[in-house]
Amino acid sequence: MLRSSGPRSYLVAPFACLTVAALALSGCSSSSSGAAGSSPSSSASTAAAASSVPAAAGSPAAASGSSASSAPAASSGSAASSPGATAGGFKVDTSKCDDPASATKVITGTYKIGYSAPLSGPVAGVVTYALDGYKARIAAENAKGGINGVKIDVQFKDDAYAPDKAKANEVQFIQSDHVDSLVTFGSGPVGAMADDQNAACIPLLYASSSVQQYRDISQYPWTVQFLPAGNAEAKYDIGVIKAKFPNGAKVGIAENQTASGKGESEAFQAAAKGTNLTISAIAPSTDPNAAATALKAAGVDVVYTAGITTDCGPVVQALARIGFTPKLVVNPSNCADGTAYVAAGAAADGNVIPKYLKDPGDPALAADAGVEQYLSEVTTADRTNTITVAGWLEADLTINTLKQAAASSTGLTHVGVIQAARDQSYASPMLINGIKWVSTPTELTGFSAFQTFIWSAATKTFKADGGLIDVSGK
């Protein structure tokens, strides 16, 4: 039985914190071969994929509020007396699942994924890129036979990035379509879905969101988000600024007023505490011109954009329009889409972002095995777009997780899948060499490191600056 989420069930935000790269967060074309249709609900099975693709590199190996009382508990301790399942140190109590038998039933024939996405609305164009990458990776795996013969069927439903529609989609996916896992975009949809999917013991795998509340494995054991943890990225941002301004600096924040933007802003402010950096102004970026004016008036040295994929270009352009050139502009990882910087022109020169994805358009990576695999699988015109790469990565993480579950003693079951998702140290082919996706029974690290990239207006590309910066906490 699906439950009402109550007053804390979801975060209302008009835009998704989209995956670029990142995400970064910073996306649904119609076709007969796995694309989402134009109707609000469409099914896209990628079983009939191209017959030949290279083998995948790498073997399988915050909103506050009370916790969800109905969600099955998880721990990394010894097995409890109630029915449960454990592997790799992670344990879930299946006795509290809405359908305990379903949680441990071995999946054969087809593995169904229910994808609630904004196929319409203001962010649909960006989501198209991510879904192109996602579909291509799934299709390539199906063409090779799937997961030990089990094909992956991705079914899409439009939520227009409205939490209530995402929740309605979830109900259909679980009760009518009987999917094996879910995925979605954005903080609002994740919040709308988390309670019910945990009660149903249906994994939510690699959703484009990073709300601190749903990173609490003890309360949301079946929810796995994709985007970098806000506190980890904020520590990176503060480190970059301190390196350039060892004697301190005045920082201004251009803050998107969604849950995603406010979450980034709060994490950044928390990371700045105890340093010699002063937060001198926080300006809503709803009106970029007003934000730029406020930041200039505050006389800040550094501008940090706490926002989503579509924010960074307009903020930089607004700064240029009023003749304000900060000494440094730091953008979040979800602003790695180069098209926004090209549109901003010379004003974007020198902007800094953290990245973790390889750039398939970089000539220096032409012979990279991961890039070669990616380009062989993704044939759409947007294949060099960072957001497309991020979508591909989300699917690749899912595939690696399913392979790992299938090879485990628990097998390809809902329990086996979430156990595998909580036991990852995976160097996906499109992660920058040296970066891994890391997850343990007690903590979702996600991306283990970032690399600093600086935008060059002259070459219209990002240029790497220095080596990897570890954010895993080790």
Give the role of each language-model region.
Residues 378, 384-388, 399-461:
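Segments of small-molecule ligand-sensing domains
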